[in-house]
Design a protein with these regions (language model features):
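Conserved subregion of the PPM/PP2C metallophosphatase catalytic domain
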Residues: 2-5, 9-174
Length: 174
């Protein structure tokens, strides 16, 4: 996606469009294909594209789907085991304007599981082993604490050259 104000504007536009599609009841895969086509058409004039990482979670069943267009890995932690979800689709806007599908991975989550979504500014372009190790070893209870630790540590792992964003979810039973 890049970094700086232009990349921020492009990703902001993508988020707004995707939110509108989803709030209107469009299913995630159709919404993402439409977003990809819209960005591809827009890109013919402005060269715009963006990575997309979308997590859909049914809080009643625990069924989750991770949708990706060119996004950094997503990590799921169950106990101390961390799995890595990746994809091969190009960023939205570059993935072909004909409604090319995003990568989709399905996973079942339950109380006590954690999900980590990061940008490539956190995961870096080198090995992301440090992210997986840090995520597996985290002993705290606060997603906010883990998020801040990952952002802070990413600068030492090649992430300082790009925008850095991390989102941590911990599922709890209520």
């Amino acid at each position: 996606m890049g970094s700086g104000p232009e990349a921020g504007q492009e990703s902001g536009l993508a988020v707004r469009l995707l939110e509108q599609f989803l709030r209107a009841g469009v299913r995630p895969e159709a919404a993402l294909k439409t977003l990809n086509s819209a960005l591809a058409l827009r890109g013919e004039e402005t060269g715009g594209f963006t990575t997309v990482d979308l997590l859909r979670l049914d809080l009643f069943t625990g069924e989750a789907a991770v949708y990706k267009y060119g996004a950094a890995p997503t990590y799921v932690r169950k106990g101390k085991t961390v799995s890595r979800i990746t994809g091969s689709a190009l960023p939205a806007g570059l993935a072909g304007g004909d409604g090319a599908a995003p990568d989709v991975a399905k996973v079942r989550l339950e109380a006590g599981d954690w999900v980590l979504l990061v940008t490539d500014g956190v995961a870096g372009s080198d090995s992301d082993l440090w992210v997986r190790q840090r995520f597996a070893a985290f002993e705290g209870e606060s997603p906010k604490d883990l998020t801040q630790a990952l952002i802070d540590e990413s600068a030492g792992h090649g992430g300082a050259t790009d925008d850095r964003t991390a989102l941590v979810l911990r599922l709890e039973k209520r």
